[in-house]
UniProtKB/Swiss-Prot annotation:
Domain of life (superkingdom): Eukaryota
UniProt entry keywords in alphabetical sequence: Disulfide bond, Lectin
Keyword Disulfide bond belongs to the record: yes
Lineage: Eukaryota, Viridiplantae, Streptophyta, Embryophyta, Tracheophyta
Protein name as annotated: N-acetyl-D-galactosamine-binding lectin subunit B
Its job: Gal / GalNAc-specific lectin. Agglutinates both native and trypsin-treated rabbit erythrocytes but not human erythrocytes irrespective of blood group type.
Subunit structure: Disulfide-linked heterodimer of A and B chains.
Organism this protein belongs to: Iris hollandica
GO MF terms, alphabetically ordered: carbohydrate binding
Length: 20
């Protein structure tokens, strides 16, 4: 699993928005 992938980045941003 690569954390540098654009998909992961977008997912992280989405999760972060929900968590905040």
């Amino acid at each position: 699993v690569d954390d540098t992938t654009p998909l992961s980045e977008e997912t992280m941003m989405r999760i972060g928005g929900y968590m905040v």
